């Protein structure tokens, strides 16, 4: 069976080929994204494997179906880039990797928090220039502060476990309550209360129509002055222009982002020799109290191994007629 694998980097290929030793699928790797222009390269493939920024729109799916593609395998947890209704109508099965390594994303989240709090990124640049001044590097003790965790799935819970060790007070919000939150000493509250009481707010929820621009100008207005916000989930959860305005007004004291709502044309590529055309992103990246990483929170050896393993296992189960627990259906 032939599989077209889009948006692959060297690290993807390494782990996928390693796991494929037990399946012997015929793999064809492409280092560019799936879109209306590149869909033709999936000809003669039964399966297309894609990542977070690939185009799974109705138009693309229609072209895939015409080529005979029967499975779209996402090697990520999110599936907002795939038109699930269209896939179902076209007879294309969609599978994903729901929990490849919650700890990987959680640990990166904490890394962003600590770097922003203790100004480590600024201190690093200073010491490289023999500037050992401590002016402007004052942080705060995490111990005793209040963190608001929005989204209490596996990643949110992994973040809570770490922050409990810091001695933080944990507030949580999620429409679907997880009993582990109380076991960790956390407390569920409504969003407005979480906004008002949290010194740090961290996002761990999916990109859905209901969550689009969850953090907007109205939400920022309800928060403490100087709040720290970290987003390692989906870029569309934050209204970026509203965040810039809140940074200028010092409502947001620090912002850590591993995702960006218009990241498709930026992330996963080397743009160092180009002029970034996204003015909003350029303004955001110019702020000294903003720390951006390029959607790397998942990037650990363990996560890459799990992603490859579950992705190929999903495909094998579907082609073998076995039950696959990771099928994604339209709501």
Curated annotation (Swiss-Prot):
Q: What class of enzyme is it?
A: oxidoreductase
| EC number(s) given by UniProt | 1.1.1.-
**Could you tell me the keywords of this UniProt record?**
NAD, Oxidoreductase
Identify the catalytic residues: 234, 263, 295 (proton donor)
GO molecular function list: D-lactate dehydrogenase activity; NAD binding
Report residues binding NAD(+): 154-155, 232-234, 258, 295-298
Q: Which InterPro entries match?
A: D-isomer_2_OHA_DH_cat_dom, D-isomer_DH_CS, D-isomer_DH_CS1, D-isomer_DH_NAD-bd, NAD(P)-bd_dom_sf
Q: Which Pfam families match?
A: 2-Hacid_dh, 2-Hacid_dh_C
Entries under PROSITE patterns matching the protein: D_2_HYDROXYACID_DH_1 (PS00065), D_2_HYDROXYACID_DH_2 (PS00670), D_2_HYDROXYACID_DH_3 (PS00671)
UniProt similarity note = Belongs to the D-isomer specific 2-hydroxyacid dehydrogenase family.
- Fetch the PANTHER family from UniProt: 2-HYDROXYACID DEHYDROGENASE HOMOLOG 1-RELATED (PTHR43026:SF1)
Give the protein's recorded name.
Answer: 2-hydroxyacid dehydrogenase homolog
Question: Its gene?
Answer: ddh
């Amino acid at each position: 069976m032939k599989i077209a694998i889009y948006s692959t980097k060297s690290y993807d290929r390494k782990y996928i080929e390693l796991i494929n030793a037990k399946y012997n699928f015929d793999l064809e790797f492409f280092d560019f994204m799936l879109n209306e222009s590149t869909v033709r390269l999936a000809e003669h493939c039964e399966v297309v494997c894609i990542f977070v920024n690939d185009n799974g729109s109705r138009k693309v799916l229609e072209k895939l179906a015409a080529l005979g593609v029967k499975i779209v395998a996402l090697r990520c947890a999110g599936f907002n880039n795939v038109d699930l209704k269209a896939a179902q109508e076209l007879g294309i099965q969609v599978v994903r990797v729901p929990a490849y390594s919650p700890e990987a994303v959680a640990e990166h989240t904490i890394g962003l928090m600590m770097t922003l709090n203790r100004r480590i990124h600024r201190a690093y640049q200073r010491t490289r220039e023999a500037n050992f001044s401590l002016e402007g590097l004052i942080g705060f003790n995490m111990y005793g502060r209040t963190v608001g965790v929005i989204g209490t799935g596996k990643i949110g819970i992994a973040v809570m476990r770490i922050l409990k060790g810091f001695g933080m007070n944990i507030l949580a919000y999620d429409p679907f309550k997880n009993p582990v939150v109380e076991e960790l000493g956390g407390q569920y509250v409504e969003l407005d209360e979480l906004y008002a009481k949290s010194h740090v707010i961290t996002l761990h929820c999916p990109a859905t129509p209901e969550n689009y621009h969850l953090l907007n100008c109205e939400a920022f207005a309800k928060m403490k002055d100087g709040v720290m916000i970290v987003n390692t989930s989906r870029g569309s959860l934050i209204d970026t222009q509203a965040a810039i305005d809140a940074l200028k007004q010092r409502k947001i004291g620090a912002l850590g982002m591993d995702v960006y709502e218009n990241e498709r044309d930026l992330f996963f590529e080397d743009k160092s020799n180009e002029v970034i055309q996204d003015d909003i992103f350029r303004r955001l990246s110019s702020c000294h109290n903003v720390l951006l990483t390029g959607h790397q929170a998942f990037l650990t050896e363990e996560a890459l191994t799990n992603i490859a393993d579950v992705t190929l296992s999903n495909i094998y189960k579907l082609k073998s007629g076995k039950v696959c627990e990771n099928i994604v259906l339209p709501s």
